[in-house]
Amino acid sequence: MGVPQALALLADPEFIRWRGQFTPGLSERLISHCLDRSTLIIRNRSVLPAAWLPAVVQSALISSPVRIDRVETWDLDKAAGTQSVQLHLAPGRAWGDAALTPTGPRTSTLSYTITVVADVPILAGAIERSVTGHLGPALQHQAQALSAYRTP
């Protein structure tokens, strides 16, 4: 799918709702979808899958599910955006960039650069590696949603 078609899907709240259920193990709920001339802001909420954290962290730090609030801000003119992820009830956050790059007349690639930071002495590295190891494939799966979606 080309960049204009991919951006049109991101601008469609129905696609974003569908995409939120597309990634196995990470169900996102659309909180808000704001579109103006050239800026799109998408806010989603989900729960961090317990398997994304090392076992020692699951038992030591987490007493209830970790809520994830994700904000995607897209500059539609540049086909580029930022991602911000806040983890609630866990000491961590993530942020990064996203870009839609044309690879042909009707094809494009959605790529992410994400930084994950855990604020836990001694365990931070293990948490960051574990979450990153799961987040990368989840974002890749969401990128695949662009070509898997069929307009209802």
Task: Report each predicted region and the residues it spans.
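Hydrophobic ligand-binding cavity/cleft-lining segments
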Residues: 1-52
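Hydrophobic pocket/interface hotspot
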Residues: 6-10, 112, 146
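Short, solvent-exposed secondary-structure boundary motifs
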Residues: 16-25, 59-65, 87-93
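Short small/polar-residue motifs
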Residues: 21-31, 67-71, 94-98
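Glycine-rich portal/gate segments that line the openings of hydrophobic small-molecule binding cavities
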Residues: 30-85
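Beta-strand/loop substructures that line and gate deep hydrophobic ligand-binding cavities in soluble
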Residues: 40-42, 71-73, 79-133
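Alpha-helical membrane-targeting segments
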Residues: 51-65, 117-137
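A conserved amphipathic terminal alpha-helix motif
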Residues: 68-71, 124-152
